[in-house]
Amino acid sequence: MKMNNKLKYFGMKWIQILFLLGISSFITTCKKDHLLDCITSSGDIVSEFRPATPFVRVEMEDHVDLVIHKSTKPSIRVTAGSHLIDGIITELSNGVLYIRNENRCNWVRSFKNQYTVDIGIDSLQSIATFGNGNITCADTLSAYEFTFDSWNASGSMDLLLHCERSHL
């Protein structure tokens, strides 16, 4: 009987050790900036304008909605919860706007949490999406040629285009 109790004791200790190892590996895999994402509320919805230079392509990743407006001046506005807006990354490089959601633990949060990027652009040549998110054109976009690529993505797409050639 005493041997059985010792086995239970050591079994419980192993379960505790494995649990602590699992928790510590979960916490250490988070980037320093996003260490507490899993327990942080999204906060009040806020909008933030970001610097924009001319671009003709958009590449976007997970859990971000895109709204496109016709504009002669390029613009980028991000709307999200105040605690999470810094995790929505917008980078411009060589005429391409890259949009990423670096917030972690999105599976913990409500599906009502939305991250939206509104862009103003004169002529858009292509959109590539690599995750979840809806794409909406608020105005008709004109271009000679337009390409839309969807790589393992889901969401709705409502494009208003006036172009000679399109690749969807």
Where are these regions (language model features)?
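Short carbohydrate-recognition loop motifs
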Residues: 96-102
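Sec-dependent N-terminal signal peptides
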Residues: 17-23
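Extracellular low-complexity Ser/Thr/Asn/Gly-rich intrinsically disordered segments
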Residues: 1-8
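Short acidic/polar N-terminal linker immediately downstream of export determinants
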Residues: 9, 13-17, 30-83, 102-120, ...
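Extended, compositionally simple hydrophobic/Ser/Thr-rich segments
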Residues: 48, 56-68, 116-168
